[in-house]
Structures are given as C-alpha cells and as structure tokens.
Curated annotation (Swiss-Prot):
Coiled coil: none annotated. This is ATP-binding cassette sub-family A member 6. Residues 478-713, 1288-1513 form the ABC transporter domain. SMART domains: AAA. It is an enzyme of class 7 (translocase). The keyword Nucleotide-binding applies. Belongs to the ABC transporter superfamily. ABCA family.
Amino acid sequence: MNMKQKSVYQQTKALLCKNFLKKWRMKRESLLEWGLSILLGLCIALFSSSMRNVQFPGMAPQNLGRVDKFNSSSLMVVYTPISNLTQQIMNKTALAPLLKGTSVIGAPNKTHMDEILLENLPYAMGIIFNETFSYKLIFFQGYNSPLWKEDFSAHCWDGYGEFSCTLTKYWNRGFVALQTAINTAIIEITTNHPVMEELMSVTAITMKTLPFITKNLLHNEMFILFFLLHFSPLVYFISLNVTKERKKSKNLMKMMGLQDSAFWLSWGLIYAGFIFIISIFVTIIITFTQIIVMTGFMVIFILFFLYGLSLVALVFLMSVLLKKAVLTNLVVFLLTLFWGCLGFTVFYEQLPSSLEWILNICSPFAFTTGMIQIIKLDYNLNGVIFPDPSGDSYTMIATFSMLLLDGLIYLLLALYFDKILPYGDERHYSPLFFLNSSSCFQHQRTNAKVIEKEIDAEHPSDDYFEPVAPEFQGKEAIRIRNVKKEYKGKSGKVEALKGLLFDIYEGQITAILGHSGAGKSSLLNILNGLSVPTEGSVTIYNKNLSEMQDLEEIRKITGVCPQFNVQFDILTVKENLSLFAKIKGIHLKEVEQEVQRILLELDMQNIQDNLAKHLSEGQKRKLTFGITILGDPQILLLDEPTTGLDPFSRDQVWSLLRERRADHVILFSTQSMDEADILADRKVIMSNGRLKCAGSSMFLKRRWGLGYHLSLHRNEICNPEQITSFITHHIPDAKLKTENKEKLVYTLPLERTNTFPDLFSDLDKCSDQGVTGYDISMSTLNEVFMKLEGQSTIEQDFEQVEMIRDSESLNEMELAHSSFSEMQTAVSDMGLWRMQVFAMARLRFLKLKRQTKVLLTLLLVFGIAIFPLIVENIMYAMLNEKIDWEFKNELYFLSPGQLPQEPRTSLLIINNTESNIEDFIKSLKHQNILLEVDDFENRNGTDGLSYNGAIIVSGKQKDYRFSVVCNTKRLHCFPILMNIISNGLLQMFNHTQHIRIESSPFPLSHIGLWTGLPDGSFFLFLVLCSISPYITMGSISDYKKNAKSQLWISGLYTSAYWCGQALVDVSFFILILLLMYLIFYIENMQYLLITSQIVFALVIVTPGYAASLVFFIYMISFIFRKRRKNSGLWSFYFFFASTIMFSITLINHFDLSILITTMVLVPSYTLLGFKTFLEVRDQEHYREFPEANFELSATDFLVCFIPYFQTLLFVFVLRCMELKCGKKRMRKDPVFRISPQSRDAKPNPEEPIDEDEDIQTERIRTATALTTSILDEKPVIIASCLHKEYAGQKKSCFSKRKKKIAARNISFCVQEGEILGLLGPNGAGKSSSIRMISGITKPTAGEVELKGCSSVLGHLGYCPQENVLWPMLTLREHLEVYAAVKGLRKADARLAIARLVSAFKLHEQLNVPVQKLTAGITRKLCFVLSLLGNSPVLLLDEPSTGIDPTGQQQMWQAIQAVVKNTERGVLLTTHNLAEAEALCDRVAIMVSGRLRCIGSIQHLKNKLGKDYILELKVKETSQVTLVHTEILKLFPQAAGQERYSSLLTYKLPVADVYPLSQTFHKLEAVKHNFNLEEYSLSQCTLEKVFLELSKEQEVGNFDEEIDTTMRWKLLPHSDEP
C-alpha cells in the first residue's frame, strides 16, 4: 500500500498559501475588507479631531464665599402643593436675605408647576414638598446643577483663563442657596431656634485639583464603543470565508487526510496577520490624535492585537455552532456589543473582583475593562508603564492574560465542537472522545447480533448474482456486511440502504448502478468515511471503517471523487493540484513531478495556468478527477466521475482507470449505462436501497432475456408479415419490436447465435422481397436496467437505440402536447405586457418573501438605523432617573464599621475653635457617618485628596460657623455637606428627624444633549434612505444565473421585467419610508407641528423618491451586472454621499440653491434634502410671519417633483442601455419599443475550406431556404454562415487582444418535424452556436431565422445547459410564472401545467422549493419549462444531463411527442450519444468551431464507422492464448482492443465481417471448439465515429491565435440579453 505521511506543518503552509492567493486575487473583496477597517479608523481620527483633548494644569484651592452672596433677583421659585405648612415654610424661606426680590409662586399641583417652569426657562426653580422634612428641588440640569453623579471627562476646566469646576454650579447658581434657605425655615419652624446666621454664613472651599486630561462629555464612552466594534468588518469576512470553505471543502479535504488543526490554523494565521497590521494602524491613530496620552504605543497595540485574536477565535467557535455566515455575524456582533457594553459598569461601579474575573472570560468585556484602566490612569496623568512603583499598571497584565486565555478557550472549543457537531449526517466524534485514545465515533457501534450472524460468503449462487471468477477469490478488498442507513426526515425515518451484502474485489472495476435515490451516494459516503452506517459493518483490507484509527489508515490510500467539483476557483489548475498533493501528504520534493504527471495524463498542460473559475464544466470535472488520482491511491471511490465530459475526455478517463485496474480497487457510480457497460468488469445494480443483481454485462444481458437487435432496411415492396414469418422460421422466439417506413427491427435471443449463420445466409438472398440491407447490434445495459426497473425499454434506433414506446407514458406526453393546440390564442400586445408585469411582480414578491437573509439584513440595518434614537431615549431616561436622586450621605461617606470602598471615604472634621466641639461631633454620629477629627493647626482640609469632603468648624461653642471643603471630583459634595450640617443643627436642638433633599430633572421632553452620535432622527433618515440596494439589486442575481435571458427568450418584454420588479420594490420601499415617518412623528410629536400642506408634500415626494431611487439602482445593477452584488457596499456609498451632501449644505448655511442642486445630483439625498428644505423654508417663514402657520408656495411644490424628473431620466437611461445590448427584443416591446430595422448580416470573414460534401450540400440548402419567399417551404430553424469571435485576454498591458473563435462559418437548417443533434467535444462551439440561435449572443457574422422571422420573441422554447431556476421558488410557481410570461390564459395555463406534471410524474414535487429538489428533478423542470406554450422551435442544450435512465426515457418520449406530426423543429446538443441515436433524425458533429459532418446516424456510420466489435468470454483462462491465435487466423486484420482475464475484445474491419452469415458460422465453430461461454458481435457505434473526429480537435492544427478548443477557457458572454 502506498502510505503517505500527513504533516500538519505542510498542510497548514499549503492552505495558508492558498488563502494568501485568494486574498491577492480577489482584490475587490480584499480592498473592501481592508478599506472598511481603515475607513473606520479614519472616522475615529476625524471624530477625535473634533474633540478637544486638553491637559488641565491643576488648580489651587478656591474659596467660593458665603452662601448668601448669591444674587437671586432673576430667579422665580415655584412650589407645590399649597398647604398651611408649605406656605408657612415658603414665607419664612422668602425672608432669607439671599432671596430678596425673588418671586415665589405656589402651584396647586405638579402639572401646573411644570407649565410655569417651562415658561420661565432657565431661571425658574421648583420645590415639591413630600412632607415637612422631605422636599425635592427642580433645577435646569447642566446649568444650575451637574448632569451626572460622576464625571470622567472634565470635572474642571479653563474658561478663558478662569478656572472653574462642575461642582461649583451648585454653589454659584442658586441650588445650595435655595436649599439652605429652605433648611433654615424648616429648622426654625420645627425647633423655634434661629439658625439663619449659622447656615447663611457657611463658606465653600474646593480642595486643590491635580493636573488631568480634559475630555468632552461621553468622549471616553464613545471611543471605547468605536474601538470595541473596530474589527467588525474583519469579523464579517472571517465568518463568510470560514463558513463557506468549511461547508464546501473541509470534509472533502478531510477525506484526503487533512488535519482539523491545519484548517483552523491556516485561516487563523492569515487573519492574525491582518489583525497585527490593523492593530498597528489603529494604535498609530490613537497615539497620533492623542485619544490616549500617557500610555505607550506597545501597551495599546498588545491590547488591540490580543483582542482581535480573541475575536477571530470567537468567530471560529460561532461558525462551528451556528454553521451560517449571516447568523454567525449577527451573533458575534450582538455578543461583542452586549459583553463590551457590560464592561462599562466598571467605569461607574466597582464590581466584586470574583465577578469581574468571571466576566473577563468574555473577551469584549476584558477589552473594555482594559481600555477603562488605561483611560482612568490617563485621566489622572498616569500611564500603563513597566515597572510601575504604584502597582496600578500590573492589572493590565491580568487583562492581557485574560484576552490570551479567552482566545485559547474559544479556539479549543471550536476544535472540540467541530468534531462533535458536523454538517448534516456526516461522521462525528462522541462528546467524550478525548477520554478514549481510539477516538471512537458517535454511532459507531452496530448491532452486534447481526455481525455475529454474518456469513463469509457474499451471495449464494443464484440467477441474480454471477459467481465470482476463481482468480478473484481471496482478493476481497471491500467487504460490505448487512449495511443499513437511515436518515431522519420530516415524515419519519427514511431508509436509504436496506441490508446491503456484497464484496468488491481488487483488480476489478466495479460500477454501482441505480435510479436517482437508489442509495448509490449514501453507500459511497459510508465507504469514504463521511457517513456511518446505522447498522452493519464495512471493512477495507480488513480494517473497520467504524474505528477512527483504521479509517485514518484507509484514507491514506484512498482517492475520492464526489458528485460535485472540488477545485478552488481562485487557484489555477496547477495550483489546485499542488495544494491537494500537499494535503494528501505527498513529499514536497515529489509534488511538482506528480502534478506534471497528472497534467500530462489528462492533457491539461495548456490550461495549467488558467484559473479554475474560467474552466468549462468538463474541464473542471477533469481537474476534480485529477485531484482524485493524485499520489496513485490504491482505492478509488468515484461518484459519477465523467458527468459533463465530452466523449473524448470521457475516453481519456476510462483509459486511465483501465491502466490502474491491476492491484487497485476501483468503484464508481454512474447514470450512464454505456459507461458501465464499456468500463466496468462487474456491475452492481441497486434499487430502493437494496442490491438487485450483480455481474458482467454479458451475464446481465443473458439473464434478462435481451440479445441482439437485427435491423432490416426495406423498400416499398417489402411485406413485413412475410419477413417476420421468414425470421421466426429460423428463430421461433424472435420478436418484431419496431416497424416504420425505412426498416424493421427484431430482437434475437442471445442463446440462438448458432442459428445466425443460416439466417444471414438466407437474408443475403432476400433482395427480391424488399430487404435492401441489414445490420446487427448487441442490446445495451440500459435496456437491462430499464427492464429491472419494470419500465418499458428504449432500444437504440438503427442499430442501438430504436424507441420502444410505453403506450401509457406516450399517451400522456401526446396528451400534454395536445393541450397546447387546444388552447385559445395567447394574449398579445398590451394585454400580454400587463400579464407579464404582474407575473414579474409576483416573482419579485415571492423571492423577497423567501429571502430570509435579505430580510434579516434589512432588520439588522433597520435596527442600526434606529439604534441612535433608542440610545438617545435611553440616555434621556437615564439622565432623568440619575438626576432624580436623593442626596444621601452614603453616596460619598462610609458608615462606622464599613470597609473602605471606592469612592467612599470618611468625613474629615477640622476643629478651628478653641473649645471642644463634641456636641457637633455627636450630632454627626447620629447620621451614621464615619468621622475623622483633626485640628486646624495640623491640616486645613484643602490638601487632603484622600477625603471626599471636610467640614471646618470655627467660632465658639453653641455659636459655630462652618466651612465646607469638597474634592472637585465629587460633583454633589456641597449639597450633601450642607444637608449634614443642617441635620447636625437639628440634632443639637434635640430633634430626631432628618431633613431629606432630592434633586429632580427639569420637565423637558427633549434635552439638548450632544452625545457624539448623530442626531437620532437625522441618522434614521440617512440610513433608511441608504437601505435601498439591499432591496433592489436582485436583477444582478437573475443576470448571473441567466434567468433574465431565459425569461426574455420565453417572450418577456424587457420593460415588463423592470416594471414588474419596480411594482414590488417601490411599494416595499414606500412602506419602509412610511414606517420611518411614523417613528419620526412618534419621537417628535410633542413639539412637531405638521400642517396638511406638509403632509400633502410628503405624499407627493415619497412615491417619486422611492421610484427614482429604485430605478437609479436598477441602472447601477445593469451597469455592474457582471460583478458581485455588493449591496452593503452600495448602501455605504449612498450613506457616504448623502452625508457629504448634507455637510456641503451645512457649510453653506443651508443655501436653497445649493440644497436643491444637491437634491438633483444625488438621488439618495433627495428625501433628506427635502426634509432639510422644509425646515429651512419653515424657519424663513417664521422669521417673516411669527404668528402664521407655514404654507408651501408654488415654487416649493415644484421641488416635490424633482424625484419624478429623476425617475423619468433613469428609466430613459435604462432603456438606452437595454437597447445597446439587444435591439431584437425591443422591437415588439410596448413601452421600450423601437422601429423595426433591416437585418444587417455582416459578411463572414472566412470562406469554407476543404468541407465535406454533406456540409457543402447543407450550406447550399440553407442559402436557398434563406432566400425563398414561400413560407411553407422555409425550415423552422435557419442558421446561415454563423461566425462568432470573442475577445481574449491580454498577455500584457501593451499587447493586443487575441481573438478566440467559437464558431467558424457554420450553416444548417432544421425542417418541420425534424430533430437535429449537434454533437462535439467540450469547447467545440455547440453552446455558442445555440446561444446565437437563441439570441442570447449576437453573431459576429451570419444570420439566424426562426420560423421565417429574425426575432426570437414568442417563437422559442429553450432548455439551457445550466439550471436557470430560482432556488426559493417551488416547481409550481416556476411553471405559473413562465406560463404567464408566454401569454397563456389562466385556464389554459392550469390545464397545460396539470398535464405536464402528470406526464413527468412531478406531483410530489409541485410545492417543493427548487433548492430542495434533486438534480434530476431540477433538470426535468428546465425541460418542462421549455415545453410550455406552443413554441414552434425547441432548443435543447444537454437536456438530460444528471437524469437517471427512467427520467431520460420520459424526456425522450416527450421530445418525440412534441415533434410527432407537428410543425415543430428541435435542435439538440448532447454528450450522451445514445440520446442522439435514440432521438435525432440527423446529427451534425462540430470540431473546433467547424461542422465536420452532417447526416443521418446510419449514413455517418456507413461513411465513417467501418468496423465491428467482437467480444469473447472463455470459461477457462488456459484457453485465452489458443482462442486469440484462432481469431487472428480467422480474421487476419483483427486488432486486439483489450485483453482482461477471460474477456477478449477485437475490432474487425468490414471486409473481414461481410457476409455476416459466414462470420457467425466461424464464430459458432470457435465457440464449439474452444468451449466459449459466450460471444457478441456488433457494429461500430456512433461513439466510435465521434471519437475519431474528436481527435482532430485534440491534435490542433489551427491558426496561431486559436488554442485547441479542448483547452479553451469557458468563453465569456459578451452579448447578454
């Protein structure tokens, strides 16, 4: 066994190189990835430049003077409620000297008081009495009192040379003065002791203020939020890339030996590099703009770098848990926002250390706490430095450690869940796998009792299973024992495999056959280790696949080719091979040699430097096969390996597999019975999860009663009854299967070959009975399969595939077709246009309704838009709540016995009297305050920054005077200390009550608070007006999947497509705008005055704005239709452009001319500009007429129509662009109509050289048909001198583009009732030809006529090569949309759809979304859509690809029913030559863009295929040499094709075969003399003819500018619909 050593380092390096190349080559995505992060950094820099970040130099203690120095003459005091006690208190309060001249008003209730206060802003103050000793003061916050309890931005400032602090507002603007007056009144009324002098003489002193860095309000919070989300763009792309690759490629790479750690490391390392660079960038911005001043570069960089790494690991974890990129992004964003914002609690509160450590497990929380540590130290002019004598910096090491630990935890969890939570039903580990050294899988245990009962023998010898040849006994490589597989479906368990029991042998090629859903792929998934059997066991070379260790060993020698292509599109062919070679563990020194070997064997040297995304589907399939055979694995598991390959490439693959047959185990599944017949030594046929039969082709054909097909060519005098009697005379059990005007086809049993010599001898004498000739062919494996499936067989026309119709199915097909002829005339002109508009509107609505991703994105963007508005309201609510607080002592001061707790301290009492102040001390202790008493001689209290406040007591006993000293950081210190003194005096007068004072916010519904965010309403307008690209760029997807082309070919008017889309998009956008208006109104309704004229103006402008923006985006979508959709990027452009336009108008002071100009030039800004326009006009009107309501003038109403002029302009531009790309479709369009133009066929640049005589005849016939004026004589399809050139890629900037020619002067026509097959290898020009005929691309030269008309519209049914379907729509919805597009009336459409569904057995799939249908059903749907309507022309581009034989039979019958006895013509391209033989009246073979031959199949065989194929199977291997010698003796020119074991194959020239009677006589003698088991003789097939012609394309021999088309890239679509 060829074992290879897998190195994690080698795999990681290879994947890292792949990721780097991906980033380098996908420049737009990488630019977006980097650009958004850089742009966010620049926004931070811009935001920082608008903020003043100034170092406050410090301030000496300040004496603010006495309380009664306040001048209150401008104040108004309003109180409530009015009672005797409150009046008494307020009367006494008014006597205070500081309130002299102050107006004191009583209000009966709070509502009335609020009205008075609002009318007298900002100098009115309110008082609400709760009881005698409790009241609430209402001041204008921010002016008379601070906004917050704490302030980390700037508690002191330098106001033009005068230092001031926030807490002094209480003292200087009347709050403490009014508090003191009220407290004095309460104490005097309660105790009858005068305290006016004691309280009014209180002086205020601020402690000294140390230097610090001043910042604007919420400056720190906003920057932390910016930094927290700075890596969000990167997170988006990480989740997108990782989720996509994990879903698409990771499991396949694991089958090749990829280690999980290598996958995650490769992505982790490249994004670690990105994080490293972006962290440097953002750190430079932070230090350069001095957002943080004192902390060094390296500390900030490490914090950001570790935080970014932890986010990468978090994305890995969430992508494993959630599996979808959209959900991953949303969840990571919300977790980052939530955990990060939770960290703000550390800013304002001191959390318990244990809780803080636990929360640090969330990396955003750890990052936020780290930033807060830096900011707090920066605030006090300290930085994070090492070594740090104070020890404050060392907490940052803990933060670094936690971020590093978080990243490791997330990464380990990602690796763990990656093993136990796979996609779907794939193999996965047990949750406790790490406890078991063997790493057992979940579900690996099978039913032990079953295993014990298993027998060693594969199957007893019976009629269904051919006995294994003796030479293979003991070579059992794969042993499958009682394997069952169940899947969980919605309706319960579904059994995919039902007790399979058979062996696969080394040295044999084994094919697994079966209809779609038979269980082939399920079995292969079990064999390649992707899935685990529900029951039973599988061993490969005696290693059990259920054991992880065994599976790893098997994977080292196994190559797997799945149904889908596995290449990385962004890598070249050579790079793909090199990458997978390294993943497979091929030694680095041997990688290049191995890659070159594969390129040579698959003939891909000339495309080795082409990117995989530019390859044709066939070339991609060859690349996938090449990846599979890298390293020459001993076991090959191939799931439909040749799907999409042309016969020549398929023959190459077959040859490679035959060469590897010896000492290898090759198992493949296929839908092609011919492939199995030719390639496989042993066929295993499955049905509904069970094994039906197994054996060689000859065994299966003999067992199921199928033998030879004898075709007799007849003329007019031939009597079928006489000929049938003649045949049955020689072979009684012969059966007449097909009878038509040209021939009779009989089935002859295989065991009757001994009678063939006499039969053919007599046939040679039957020319007088009307038999002009005969030929014989073997039955195909396809017929065996159809018989096993219980269906009627389709035998090959002429000598291989004569259609044997199942009458019931055929009747259904003919009934379905007849429904079209029974219909009324289809709707046309404006009626059809309206029907199509509504059909497109319905289509758009259904897509929008089911695009969960788009709706979630819209919801997220809407949430982002409304976020500032919510934040504003929350902040206002918090502001109201925070200011409405009680001035409690415990806010700043500790209680006795309480442990020190930030920010509380003890209260310092300084005795400046010459006596004992024990009475005052005692009164303070009653207030539960921890006191510290000292003498004034020791300290004056102004330098003690370790205290929040101090009271200096002076005077003499019983007549104290007080000074209050406050730390400038404690904003509410003065009211609290004044209350402490007041309550102390109460206690000294033996009163036990305490005065309680609260502060309440001023009764404003909207507070003018700048938070650093845009105004919420403005931001809402800005974002929602930029949201439109998410809604309206669906046409790009339609273009890319060619759905738009298909709709146009089906008869859709171009204007109907856009108008139908707009009908839904505009309506949806209007709904969003109305919702925005509603939110805006609810937010501002208390102070927003809306007149009927403003409402009318909005009613006018809103639909116009929605329409203009929608058609503007349609125009953009059309221009960039070949690129990615990038809705988010366009939304950002709209947002940015609107912001710039608003800034321009703002700078120009909202000049109306500039405002209107910006509205016209930038469609996305029009609505926001109109809102601004209304506001400016309202202000102008108010200045002129203060009392009158604002009314719009006639000029103002003209501005409302700007969006409508824009809409008309964009519709016109869109029409012009459509006109440029395709004039034909516009000629009948009722809206975009243009005048009919004469056909302008360009002369062909090439003249035909050395053409076959049949091609020349067809060219003359086509030219004649083109010029004839008799419509009845015109063919259905005329393709005259078609030539197509594409511009190739430049090799360098200065070189010219070389032309690539897809079609070279081809001419042919299709008559009514005829099916013409267009054959050729990949790249021969078939699809280009059919695209020219369909009108998708414009010919470089030549012309096309369909049913006598050059326009395609309404004349064509087209089944393209790819599935042009909408994944989220159901099968029924597709049929209904296309029926409406083709103009079928509702009743006719229902009838036609019902009959087609019945004919193709699609009832169960009617309401299933396309994305959940099998590949075969989706292909059927494409074909059925082409049949809808009564189109006289059908173009079918490989219609049966991927469909099982049963489905193919239905399709073939449908095609024949469509053409039979009708005026329709069909042009068919196919790689399935049996399909061509079954259906086509004529075939044309294209090679390198030219027609090489054309004619009936038998004509081509007679002309080009001169050989017969002889197969002999001997019973004893010892006879092989003798038989070979005898055959060469009997047939001297026989060429040995293949010798394998007991099977011999030869090619015999016609000269050696004719007459057939003598040939069969010789073969019967050989069979008798050498005891042959069986033999077969058949004429050369169409495939042999095709392969011979295809060699011309392989050899090349063309002009220099043309590559051999086998090596062409997929040609670009230059002329789109």
